[in-house]
């Protein structure tokens, strides 16, 4: 029996660029040994045809849909991401087209939960150990930016209860994880650890480049 992996994370502006680089495979020398570069061209985004500027799209959505004219706090959560997957055996029993349908149905459900206009990207990675989707969105609710209001305990319970049933009704043999269980899916933990490492590494690279630019400016 296969269980649905559906894990939400919240991010501030400082983390978004690193997530963009990870999701869109913009690193020439990728440090993640689980990434098979030969299969990277098989990755796809269900929202965007080409790579995008995450922060630019996020800023545009906030400006267009947020009622308040006050500046967004630097420590505000501006981007949320949902990782959707299952175990390797689940995907091995699906054709490529059925795998895509699995992610499309999951995307459609999340669109209804967070608002289609708030979706940034839905990147499916097929070049790692297990197929999975990084579904990113701006936490806008009632014309305000608030991840706390949107992604609360009730929201998470509804997703965990409803999404597996939606997928089962579409013909996918998948179940909800055990309610109240302290055991977390290995895949989710691995995704989170790898992503956090990539974000920290990219932030260090940005700091190094900034310091070099400042040094060069002082010399000229």
Each language-model region and where it sits:
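N-terminal nicking endonuclease/strand-transfer module with a His-rich metal-binding environment
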Residues: 1-219
């Amino acid at each position: 029996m296969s269980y649905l992996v559906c894990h939400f994370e919240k991010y501030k502006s400082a983390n978004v660029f690193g997530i963009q680089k990870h999701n869109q495979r913009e690193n020439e020398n990728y440090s993640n040994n689980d990434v098979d570069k030969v299969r990277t061209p098989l990755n796809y985004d269900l929202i965007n045809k080409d790579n995008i500027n995450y922060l630019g799209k996020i800023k545009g959505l906030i400006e267009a849909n947020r009622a308040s004219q006050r500046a967004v706090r630097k420590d505000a959560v501006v981007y949320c991401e949902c990782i959707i997957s299952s175990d390797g055996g689940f995907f091995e029993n699906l054709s490529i087209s059925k795998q895509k349908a699995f992610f499309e149905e999951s995307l459609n459900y999340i669109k209804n939960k967070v608002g289609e206009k708030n979706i940034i990207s839905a990147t499916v990675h097929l070049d790692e150990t297990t197929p999975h989707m990084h579904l990113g969105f701006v936490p806008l609710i009632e014309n305000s930016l608030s991840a706390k209001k949107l992604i609360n305990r009730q929201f998470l319970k509804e997703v965990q209860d409803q999404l597996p049933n939606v997928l089962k009704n579409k013909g996918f043999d998948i179940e909800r994880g055990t309610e109240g269980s302290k055991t977390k899916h290995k895949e989710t933990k691995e995704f989170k650890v790898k992503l956090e490492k990539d974000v920290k590494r990219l932030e260090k690279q940005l700091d190094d480049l900034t310091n070099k630019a400042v040094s060069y400016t002082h010399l000229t």
